[in-house]
Amino acid sequence: MSKKVTDTVQEMAQPIVDSLQLELVDIEFVKEGQSWFLRVFIDSDDGVDIEECAKVSEALSEKLDEADPISQNYFLEVSSPGAERPLKKKADFEKSLGKNVYIKTYEPIDGVKVFEGELAEFDGQTVTVEITIKTRKKRINIPYEKIANARLAVTF
C-alpha cells in the first residue's frame, strides 16, 4: 500500500466528523499483541459523548467496508482523546494557552528534552512554557519544529 493507512482513513473520516461539527484529533493504526487496532479520536469544545462516538464509528465502518483499504483484520475504536489529549496541530497549541502541557523535544534545549508546565505563549513558530523549579518560575522557548510530541498534562 503506497499510502499510509492513517492517511487513507483520515480522508474517509474527516467529512464524517465535519458533518457532525466535531474535530478529528488523531488516528492510530497499531498492533497490540496479535490484534490490530484502528483508533480514531474525536472531540469538540464541549467534549464528545457515546452517541457521537457511535455515529462516527457506524458511518466510518460503512465507508471502510466499501473501500476496504486495510488488508488485515482490525478492531475499530472511536473515542475522545481523554484529559491528556495530544497536541498535534498548531491550532491545538493555540486552543491550549493557559493549560498545563507535557512536551518532549527531538533534541535538548538547555540540556533538557522533557518540559512540563503552563503553555504561556504560542506565536506559530515558538511555544513558550512556564515551568516551576522549586519556587522559581522560568519561561522556556521551544521551537515548534523541535517538538517530538506534546499533550495536555493533568496535575493534581
Curated annotation (Swiss-Prot):
Keywords: Cytoplasm, Ribosome biogenesis. SUPFAM superfamilies: YhbC-like, C-terminal domain, YhbC-like, N-terminal domain. The keyword Cytoplasm applies. Its main location: cytoplasm. The keyword Cytoplasm applies. One of its GO terms (cellular component) is cytosol. It is found in: Cytoplasm. Gene3D superfamilies: Ribosome maturation factor RimP, C-terminal domain (2.30.30.180), RimP-like superfamily, N-terminal (3.30.300.70). Signal peptide: none annotated. Required for maturation of 30S ribosomal subunits. PANTHER family: RIBOSOME MATURATION FACTOR RIMP. Belongs to the RimP family. NCBIfam families: PRK00092.1-2. This is Ribosome maturation factor RimP. It comes from Bacillus subtilis (strain 168). The lineage of its organism: Bacteria, Bacillati, Bacillota, Bacilli, Bacillales. The gene is rimP.
